[in-house]
Amino acid sequence: MAKIIDGKKISQEIKDELKERVAALKEKGVEVTLAVIQVGNNPASTVYVGNKKKACAYVGIRSLAYELPEETTEAELLELVEKLNKDDSVNGILVQLPLPNHIDEDKVIKTIAPEKDVDGFNPESVGRLSIGQKGFVSCTPAGIIQLLKRSDIEIDGKECVIIGRSNIVGKPMSMLLLRENGTVTICHSHTKDLKEVTKRADILIVAIGKTKFVTADYIKEGAVVIDVGMDRDENGKLCGDVDCADVEPKAGAITPVPGGVGPMTIAMLMHNCVSSVEE
């Protein structure tokens, strides 16, 4: 039976460590400030933004909320980002995605100053990661590395397979695993004989947005399975890209949905905010 990797518990440990670091900064008269921008009122985005504000309050980070109407123009949004770039009291800027269709997401992400890009999405941040330089790392992949390390799961020399090649998870994940000396394969919708590839994995990371796609026949005995998916099953119940009930008896360790990768993403966002000030 698989060991359950408890993302809630590990993310709480990280937030508690950050709380101490923020308190130490405050003693020196330094305040950590995160600006969060939401355009429109996408219900999922509102929940995510609320969770981020809650985490900020817990850790001791000051959060500035900019809730803009759906009809905000691209120019108005870019102007706000530029203003926050120039504001020395703001350490991190986060624009909640997705943005309304009339706004070019790439343009907005590129406008965020790399030294305030706590989401790690700016092309400069991505470039730094790919050549092994210091910079902000996308929060979900960074959180997965922490889940593995804090669960004493060895990455060095291990066969690591990622299903999904998104810019937010798959690609940065591959870079971080390489940094830890994992042997990395990325699979996607054009991969031939997917099961043959995934069965080689000591560590399998699944991020494709397909409900319960990975079943026991995709993994080898004792594999570590990290489920990044956030889907709903036919009964409307929250689940992931992995059929947990089917995979769990065969896996060595597995992340649940909810309570696995999700909480880590926000913990690492807080980590990026605090690091931006300390450095």
What does each model-found stretch correspond to?
Residues 38, 94-98, 163, 207, ...:
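Short beta-strand segments
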Residues 1-30:
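Positively charged, low-complexity intrinsically disordered leader regions
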Residues 56-70, 184-186:
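Short beta-strand elements in bilobed, periplasmic/extracellular small-molecule ligand-binding domains
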Residues 76-88:
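Short, well-structured alpha-helical segments in soluble
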Residues 32-40:
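Short beta-strand segments enriched in small/hydrophobic residues
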Residues 94-155:
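Anion-binding alpha/beta catalytic cores of soluble intermediary-metabolism enzymes, centered on
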Residues 41-53, 135-224, 228, 233, ...:
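Glycine-rich phosphate/diphosphate-binding loop of Rossmann-like nucleotide-binding domains
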Residues 106-122, 126, 229-279:
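Rossmann-fold NAD(P)-binding glycine/threonine-rich loop
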